[in-house]
């Protein structure tokens, strides 16, 4: 990510897969040098994978770093002290007591001013939606719930403000909470009914996190996959326009039906300050015009700063001559509706180049970078952009 005059670079940490990141600042018109110390997760946890995802505000004041191996995101703020620039850890966002492989922090997106941060957990799964049939005290995120004749155990992922429903992650292998549940203190019992969701392993979800004027961060909304597809990987990649009006979330692993298995879907959410709920609501669902099983539409996504152009990578799509070479779909907005305007393919005749694995569009939408990491340009799988 280029941030004003700063460049963020990721490489290895001290221990196995702990990860690190460094900031480079341009010292003249052409050269970059590392201007800050290399940063590591202060806990230095094996397998934390600190630096798997990085996002920054336009001026480089706010920087968020994902550590999905331990379901965590660190937020840093750049401050000027005694004429020197420093980046310090501002806050750590913990997902709670969830499965180690939920990968909270796998993908990040941030508005230009740094006031809104979006964090995905694409491997969250086994979600059950429960409707309460009796009054019960407020549940808290991460709270342990046990009970039911199956003996299943889960933790609360989300409860709406009125406690009308809960979304619970079941930690059992196959059983689900289906009758009574009780809280940790076992003093209150409530009957619940499962109304949707079953064994949706790797459905995924996205957290919208906001910052107040005192630089305190809190979860404003949890966005779950509109389609509870097993393996959908909702939140695999994300992008947001400069103001936060349009939020793009991909689910390259869905749907889980046999017709277009793993074709992939991209969801466009819209926020309006005039809305009574002040939440992001599903605005439009994007699918490729040339539908194909296993094309993984949504492996990568980006949106122009003005919110008029969306680009979507479909890495294992097949063109007319080359198998699984990959494609990139360009959607442009007219009024409030996005429509597919262009399909880009790799100019090589190779197969499996993974064209579209990464995409980056300029702020104006006039320039587009596309990664093809498996392309054989000089050596096998040496990659190209």
Where are the language model's segments positioned?
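Autoprocessing Asn-cyclization modules and mimics
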Residues: 1-15, 21-23, 125-177, 185-200
């Amino acid at each position: 990510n280029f941030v004003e005059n700063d460049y963020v670079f990721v490489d290895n940490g001290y221990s196995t897969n702990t990860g690190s990141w460094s900031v480079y600042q341009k010292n003249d018109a052409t050269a970059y040098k590392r201007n800050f110390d290399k940063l590591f997760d202060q806990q230095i946890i094996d397998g934390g994978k600190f630096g798997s995802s990085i996002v920054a505000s336009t001026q480089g004041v706010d920087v968020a770093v994902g550590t999905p191996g331990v379901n965590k995101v660190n937020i840093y703020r750049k401050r000027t002290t005694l004429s020197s620039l420093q980046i310090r850890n501002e806050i750590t966002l913990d997902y709670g007591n969830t499965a180690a492989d939920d990968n909270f922090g796998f993908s990040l997106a941030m508005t230009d001013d740094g006031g809104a941060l979006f964090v995905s957990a694409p491997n969250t799964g086994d979600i059950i939606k429960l409707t309460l049939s009796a009054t019960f005290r407020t549940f808290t995120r991460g709270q342990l719930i046990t009970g039911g004749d199956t003996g299943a155990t889960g933790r609360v992922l989300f409860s709406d403000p009125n406690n009308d429903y809960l979304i619970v992650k079941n930690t059992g292998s196959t059983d689900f909470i289906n009758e009574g549940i009780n809280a940790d203190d076992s003093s209150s019992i409530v009957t619940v009914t499962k109304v949707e969701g079953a064994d949706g392993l790797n459905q995924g979800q996205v957290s919208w996190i906001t910052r107040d004027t005192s630089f305190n961060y809190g979860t404003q909304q949890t966005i779950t996959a509109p389609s509870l597809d097993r393996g959908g990987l909702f939140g695999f990649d994300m992008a947001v326009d400069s103001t936060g009006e349009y939020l793009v979330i991909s689910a390259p692993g869905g749907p889980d039906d046999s017709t277009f298995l793993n074709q992939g879907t991209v969801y466009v959410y819209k926020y309006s300050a005039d809305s009574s709920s002040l939440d992001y609501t599903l605005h439009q669902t994007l699918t490729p015009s040339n539908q194909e099983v296993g094309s993984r539409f949504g492996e990568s996504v980006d949106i122009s700063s003005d919110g008029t152009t969306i680009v979507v990578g479909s890495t294992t799509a097949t063109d007319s001559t080359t198998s699984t070479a990959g494609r990139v779909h360009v959607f442009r907005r007219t009024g409030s509706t996005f429509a597919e305007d262009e399909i880009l393919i790799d100019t090589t005749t190779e197969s499996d180049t993974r064209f579209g694995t990464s995409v980056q569009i300029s702020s104006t939408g006039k320039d587009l970078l596309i990664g093809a990491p498996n392309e054989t340009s000089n050596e096998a799988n040496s990659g190209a952009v």
